[in-house]
């Protein structure tokens, strides 16, 4: 063995090696300072939307039942100036049966937003999930995707596109004066960089995307803004595939105004550099950018969660604060290219991420969060995530102070 001189690490380098991905010594120091801020009620804390009033609007996703909860209502009025329906404006909620539209729950959200001077995002006109299957059945009730006869396949395609246009026409004409921002299509590109092989695509090819945008513009007019919304827009090969798709559609005259970046992200992934590159790429096409479904999970993928909120270590909240600090500094830097930042929820007491927060146990019944450690049992969706800047008790977290008062 060679004799190797091992030089001692400097304090700064040693600290850097111990930090989560993306965190610098400065951001770690900032996060620690945010932890010392008062753990006060969010109902008395400085208003989040006012902090960014000169940069972009701040939104939250809601379910109608939350509009019956006094604290949720107070939170929305205090901290948010934009709102989006988490589920009740999706196709299966709006038109569960052909020709039978149900606007009751959607109307409640629109009414609340209008009464409180809030912008509204519509989510979503077209999606491969939460869509009723009648869209994809032919006149005889058979699945269109199974048809092999070329003539009948073309007939089925035209029937599907007609149904799609009717769906969009009915909704857009109802809300065009109340809702300015519309997710026209959602998640049309797969993780492999190809157009998602959904029933929409199998039956109609790329034309369903074109018809969706064209119908939204036709019936909504020029005052509404039309978006293509997707997750993992910062990740290759999906990012470039989405870019090429939008570029092609715009060159063909398809009316696309912007990209919605869902931003279901983690403390250490993706990097701010990749996020910045993504925003700049689409802005270069003349498109607006919106952050449409923001949450910062405490966990990696696949999640290995803690079973309760109180079990999550304090350090995780500090790491999350540092991430939010860096993230909103970047959003501010790019605020000429970003018009809205929407959280996919209000506070940590309600988040879709809990449904995939799996808890792993070893043979002795101890919780295992190390992604590389062996385990004996998994309880699906039994854990707790904490992705927002407000806690389940409606108190501010270190992450809140990070984006209100970042340095």
Swiss-Prot record:
SMART domains found in the cross-reference section: Glyco_10 (SM00633)
Keyword Iron on entry: no
Protein name: Endo-1,4-beta-xylanase
Signal peptide residue numbers: 1-28
Gene Ontology process terms (BP): xylan catabolic process
Disulfide partners: none
Record's subcellular location: Secreted
Domain GH10, first and last residues per copy: 42-406
One protein family per Pfam: Glyco_hydro_10
Annotated active site: 187, 293
SUPFAM superfamilies the record matches: (Trans)glycosidases
